[in-house]
Amino acid sequence: MTIVKISDVGKGLNADLTPEELQMGVWSDARNMRFANGYAQRFNGLAPIFAAPVVEPYYITAFQKPNKRLWIHAGTERVFSDDESVRTEITRLAEITISTLTHVTTTATLKTSAAHGLTTGNSVTIYGAYPLQYNGTFTITVTAPDTFTFTMASDPGADASALGHLTGPSAATANFTGTRDDRWTGGVLAGIQVLNNGVDVPQYWTGDANKLRTLPGWNAGWTAASLRPWKNYLIALDITKSGVRNPHMIKWSVAAVPGSLPDSWDETDVTRDAGELPVSDTADLLVDALPMGDVLIIYKERSMYALRFIGAPYIFQLQRIPGDSGMLFRGCAVSTPLGH
């Protein structure tokens, strides 16, 4: 038998091809070994990073804080964070719908769309309102079954243009309503985790003691099949508004201030840079998006587009990529040094 010298044996493992089809240096099987940087190395084994999850996870991602790393995992109904020693449920809380939010100097009057069930002395939390003085945790004085007042730290100077969201002192957990087929999407923008399951309103989490919360400026009657952070924006695809699906619509937020999420998605506000764009020159539906260098690749079922930031007044430019390839389902592409 002729002895053949193989100088490079660290090209990796390929279990899909038969041994006869492999090039020199590629292995058909390996146990307790890994390949990195052209070398074959002994593998030290695996160790669990946290105990068995409470729910069957259909989404998992690492969330980096300055002092530690958290693992966020989501089932169909509940979401948890785990720092490898303590597991915390961060599923959203039930909210009370705000109908009006007005002020006289530093005294705010909040009216709910139905009886709120609160009493004087209760502590409530408001977030996502604008001006920002309306946000925070306040002790209230009830003046009617659907109305209460509270004192702000300073005068907001105007009634609330964005009503925000209200949670009471004993708000119950509000489970999500997706199924296994409603794949979670999201990412990190400005150090804040965003999550979206396509059937409930998108959520965010800041990595603190708060639970998941509704995105600022997002209309309660909207959903998005996919939500991805890109540059200083959040990009949403396949938008449903008040029950009407727009499967060819791309929608983007205003640019985020560093350290904060975008506060508006209002495409009709000509003073801001939020907007919408149809991708309707092909019949296939929008699926997902993934950055590639300085562009965002928008995937439909059988076509691809490049979204580029060009600034005011159009903000983004959309260009068709030649070919008839697309994406099978959300999350079915990854970034590599050679592309997707």
Language model segments and positions:
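Small/polar beta-strand repeat architecture
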Residues: 92-181, 211
